[in-house]
Amino acid sequence: GDVQRMSAGTGILHSEYNASEAESVHLLQIWILPETTGLEPGYEQTHFTVGDRQGRLRLVGSRDGREGSVTIHQDVNLYAAVLADGDTVTQDFGPGRSLSVQVARGAVHL
């Protein structure tokens, strides 16, 4: 459950690696263009437990950092969920909004 936000802004050096020789790492990178250019480079990381995401959509990224989510420089809301067989979640995204779903394990019906 960690969510990281990295803003390259005017420039940043970055690499991804697994420091553990015993445990595998699973990650999902989502690239979102900022709504303005020339921002200072920045980094933010927040941990969300399984309980935070169990059976519900948990806001993990937003423009204003509400509900403890990481701050994203764009009009976007990112949600994470851990769902069991038969779980149902509902979210009203409002008119004119787009939706993208990433399933890390299992299957969903939309």
Where are these regions (language model features)?
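Conserved short histidine dyad/triad with adjacent acidic residue
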Residues: M6-G11, S62-E67, N77-P95
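Ligand-binding loop in jelly-roll beta-barrel domains
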Residues: A8-G38
